[in-house]
């Protein structure tokens, strides 16, 4: 698990029809690039630390203020520590901390990560239903929401084993040595995991709970989850791949806290990246990125004593990455299927680099994207059903590489809402 994946999992900003959020994001960026807020006084030159303020506004929190920090190379060159937290005008608060990619002495190819997130949102916009966390929201379900209190707690541990094949066969292999700049050459992938790419097997334990607090009742939801993932990153760069593919399959076994029902979830994803020729002086890289993601819950049933995961852990669409024009978990059912496409452009023109360099920050490039998502949920895993009455969203965004972290800002539109989101890492 990488730093960006951990942060992406829980710490995000999403606004609904709210222009004010964009203003606060601009203010936050200006504050973050002020040298008074940066700390880099480390005795070890291999450690790089940044602490920045966070200022934003959205419909769930109102105006919020916080602090975020990351230290790269603490203890080990490939490792990182991070922490973020905020409080807001409507008494919302959240904190997240993590340690990423640490190795044990004399244990090769194993990387360990830990993550904690807690939040209290007294004015959270959630869907109207009689079973918060478990109500089915099918493909044709109406959009109805209300304000409710939501308390969330997440704890996660992960062990990652990088298989000794492909790129990892090289004695000098390191997770930190992959290209992150468009000028850096990327290895040409083959079609065999033995010869190229990074293959990993991940074991993950997660405990997550979410309480929905209404005037008349409190609904407690949550689950303990054990998850295995097998992935093959057959690209030349994790952040800006110009060619190649990625594939991942995962299985989750969960036990719900409140009814002790057990469930199982299967997920798969495959992505392809296709470089377009750059014939002009205004572009550094042009790429078309395509993705197919799917999920199925074989233990699913429709009864009140359901053997199915909560909506925030199950087969769902909407939110930050899949059907981005709908809010998180807008659609939730037994199965899900979604196509995603992006056109990504890194231009030669980058006005932030010179300004950031003077302040001691590294912002080597930004990337513009046009994207479209198309998919649906269904009560059974049926290929023909998936391709009937599919939901579509479209939008545009910008990605900025700042201090080695890729910050993604997306604006997406659907038939229900216009959404903007700020998050870490590419959508896929």
Model regions: which residues?
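Transmembrane beta-strand segments of outer-membrane beta-barrel domains in Gram-negative
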Residues: 56, 115, 122-289, 378
């Amino acid at each position: 698990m990488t730093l960006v994946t951990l942060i992406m999992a829980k710490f995000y900003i999403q606004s609904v029809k709210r222009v004010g959020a964009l203003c606060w994001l601009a203010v936050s960026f200006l504050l973050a690039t002020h040298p008074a807020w940066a700390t880099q006084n480390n005795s070890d030159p291999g450690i790089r630390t940044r602490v920045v303020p966070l200022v934003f506004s959205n419909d769930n929190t109102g105006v919020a203020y916080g602090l975020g920090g990351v230290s790269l190379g603490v203890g080990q060159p490939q490792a990182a520590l991070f922490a973020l937290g905020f409080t807001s005008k409507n008494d919302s608060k959240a904190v997240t901390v993590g340690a990423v990619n640490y190795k044990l002495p004399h244990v090769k190819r194993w990387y360990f990560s830990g993550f904690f997130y807690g939040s209290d949102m007294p004015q959270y916009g959630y869907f109207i239903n009689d079973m918060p966390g478990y109500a089915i929201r099918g493909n044709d379900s109406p959009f109805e929401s209300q304000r409710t209190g939501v308390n969330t707690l997440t704890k996660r541990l992960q062990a990652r084993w990088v298989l000794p094949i492909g790129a990892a066969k090289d004695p000098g292999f390191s997770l930190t040595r992959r290209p992150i700049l468009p000028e850096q050459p990327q290895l040409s992938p083959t079609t065999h995991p033995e010869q190229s790419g990074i293959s990993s097997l991940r074991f993950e334990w997660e405990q997550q709970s979410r309480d929905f607090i209404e005037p008349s009742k409190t609904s407690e939801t949550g689950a303990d989850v054990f998850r295995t993932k097998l992935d093959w990153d057959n690209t030349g760069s994790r952040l800006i791949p110009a060619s190649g593919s990625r594939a991942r399959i995962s299985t989750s076994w969960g036990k719900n806290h409140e009814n002790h029902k057990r469930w199982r979830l299967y997920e798969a994803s495959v992505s392809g990246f296709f470089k377009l020729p750059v014939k002009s002086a205004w572009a550094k890289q042009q790429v078309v990125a395509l993705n197919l993601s799917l999920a199925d819950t074989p233990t699913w049933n429709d009864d009140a004593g359901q053997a199915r995961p909560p909506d925030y852990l199950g087969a769902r669409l909407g939110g930050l990455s899949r059907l981005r024009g709908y809010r998180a978990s807008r659609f939730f059912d037994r199965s899900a299927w979604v196509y995603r496409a992006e056109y990504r452009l890194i231009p030669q023109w980058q006005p932030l680099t010179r300004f950031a360099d003077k302040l001691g920050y590294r912002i080597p490039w930004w990337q513009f994207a046009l994207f479209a998502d198309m998919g649906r949920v269904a009560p059974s895993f049926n290929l023909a059903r998936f391709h009937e009455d599919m939901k579509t969203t479209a939008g545009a965004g910008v990605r900025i590489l700042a201090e080695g972290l890729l910050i993604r800002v997306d604006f997406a539109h659907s038939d229900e809402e216009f959404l903007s989101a700020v998050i870490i890492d590419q959508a896929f």
